[in-house]
Amino acid sequence: MNETVDGEYQAYKARGGKYTRDEFFGKYEQTKKMVASMSDEDISRLNRGGHDPHKVYAAYHQAVNQDNGKPTVILAKTVKGYGMGEAGEGQNITHQQKKMAEDALKEFRDRFEIPIADDKIADAPFYKPEEDSEEMQYLHARRKELGGYLPQRRTEGDKLQIPELSAFDKLLQGSGDREMATTMVFTRILQILTRDKNIKDRIVPIIPDEARTFGMEGMFRSLGIYSPVGQLFVPEDSDQLAFYKEAKDGQILEEGITEAGAISSFIAAATSYSNHGTTMIPFYAFYSMFGFQRVGDFCWAAGDMRARGFMLGGTAGRTTINGEGLQHQDGHSHVMFDCVPNCKAYDPTFSYEMAVIIHRGLVEMYQEQRDVYYYITICLLYTSPSPRDKRQSRMPSSA
């Protein structure tokens, strides 16, 4: 069996017992003798493990009762178009088969012992067991345990008490003569939110490895990086204020260099309001182009699932981080995100813009219960005026 590839197994089912006898069992004299007393029909009816209810039950029973703390994989060998007989069993045409002829339906019925009369078989009716049957009682019990007969989706989460815009007052006042990057502004906003008594436990900062690039390492000490096993080593920067601190109760998800894993965490938190009835506020910060290239399809998936949260595209801009190659040149990420119908894309320049946009997003998603998520680019380094400051902001000498 270990010498046989999947395509051959498919052919054995499609071409019947004689072919299987010659091509599979006939390879070796020992295996040929094993089926010498069996007819071709007997051989064609040899079942695969994935269709054997006893084997499937035994496999799941062993899987759920193992107490070793490890996941269990069940490899089930099955047959394409199982039960269709000559109409499609083991054949590639199964995928295009829209209906079965009456003779094929009768063969299917007889094979699986479905009690449908000959005069009704042409209509291919559904078979429903009696209400007091063991099968129906089992199905009703399972639906009751699952919470009802129809799948349903929560459209509203618990409404959160969002802080007033005045909570960001220092950022609304501008930076005076000091240059301030929008990356730093975002980090300060995140720090304000994680100190707010009403929503601090709902904030989920997510970073795929680039925390220091985005200036977010200052949050390591106060929030900690989540690790299910805690800190297992002494960080080389342990003597510094912003050292790499892991903790079982850490709040930051620093996933390592895996954008796919990080955005999966984002989607899980962003849909928690619907799936679990607990509203979370994820902030997923990544390289706006390098990171986007690895999660583009997930961004659409987030929209399809009505995710709510913030995605932050760091080191944005066409010439920001050229030293690491063309893969980082971002002059179009907003165009890509704008293609997702329920994603709102912004490119703020000044600190007050960043504060207003994020505050508006919090209100829109977590009070008004709108099914949108925000994409905001962060990078620009300017002197930031206040909204009422009519002075022209000075471009930095490095611009």
Where does each model-flagged region fall?
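Phosphate/oxyanion-binding loops and surfaces in catalytic or ligand/nucleic-acid-binding neighborhoods
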Residues: R111-P115, E364, K390
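Accessible peptide chain termini
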Residues: M1-E3, S384, S397
